[in-house]
Amino acid sequence: VAAFYVQKSGWASVRTSVSTIKSLVGYGLRAHVALVLQIANRRLDQLILSVALAASDLGLYVVAMTIEGPLFLAVTTMEMLLFPKIAQQLQEGGRQAVLGRYFRAALLIVIPATVIFIAIAPWLIGTVFGSAYLPAVDAARILALSGIAYTLKVMLTTYMRASNRMRIVAQSEGVGIFVTIIALAVLVPLFGLIGAAIAQVVAFTIPALFMAFLINRETGLSIVGLFRFERRDWDVFGELKTRFRRKEAE
C-alpha cells in the first residue's frame, strides 16, 4: 500500500540526486551528533552519582527522577507537533511565531503541573514507591523546578532541527555536559542527594540559556518575546485535540 501511494504521488524515481543525498546525510549526521550529546548529558549524572553517592542515595535519586519525569510528557507532545509546523514555514518570522505559540502553550501545562506536583509529591512517592522512599521528596521537588528550562531547551532544539541548524544544538549540548560535570563535582560533596538534584536543574538551565543566546545572535529571536502570552496561544490545544481524535479514529 505504501509503495502504491508513493508511486501515485510521483515521489518514486530511479534517478538519484547527489545534492539531495549529501544534504540528507549531512543533516542526519549533525542531528545524530546532537542526539548523542543530549543522551550523554542525560545519563552522565547517574554515571557520576553511581560513584559519588552511596547506593541508598542513588536509589532515592532515581526514584526522584522517575516520579517527576511524566511532568514533561506534554513537552514531548508539543515537540512532535512543533517540528512539522516550523518546517512548513518559509520565512524566519513565521518560524519564530509558531515557536512562540507552542512554547507558551507548553508552559500553560508545565507550570500548573509543576505546582501541583510539588504539593502532592510526598503522597505520590509514598503511594507509588512506599514510605521508605519519602526521603526522595525534596530531590523530586527540586528536579521539577527544571520544567521551564527543560521546555525552553526542547522547543529551541526543535526549532533548530526544523530549521536545519543543528550546529547550535550540538554546541549547547556540549556546554551541558561540561556544566553537568562541574555542577556535580561542586554540589554533590556539599549537599549530597539535594546537590545532585540542584546540579540537574543547573545542567538544564545554563545550556538552555546558552542556546537562546546563540539563536538570538544568529536569527534575532527575542527570548523575552517567547514569554509574552497571547490569546491565540490557546488555539494550540485545539490542534492537540484534533490530533488525538485522529489517533483514536486510527
Identify what each model region corresponds to.
Residues A55, G100, I118-I148, I194, ...:
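Interfacial segments at transmembrane-helix termini and the short loops linking adjacent helices
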Residues E68-G93, T157-A162:
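Helix-loop junctions and terminal segments of transmembrane helices
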Residues A144-G174:
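Membrane-interface junctions at transmembrane-helix termini in multi-pass inner-membrane proteins
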Residues V1-R42, L81, Q88-A97, T219-A249:
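Interhelical loop/hinge segments that connect adjacent transmembrane helices in multipass membrane
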Residues V25, A87, G94-I120, V137-A140:
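Interfacial transmembrane-helix starts/ends
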Residues A52-A55, Q89, A162-S163, L190:
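Helix-loop interface residues and adjacent transmembrane-helix termini in multi-pass membrane transporters
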Residues R30, D45-L47, G59-V75, R104, ...:
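Alpha-helical transmembrane segments of polytopic membrane transporters and translocases
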Residues V1, G126, A140, N164-R167, ...:
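Membrane-interface helix-loop junctions in multi-pass transport and translocation proteins
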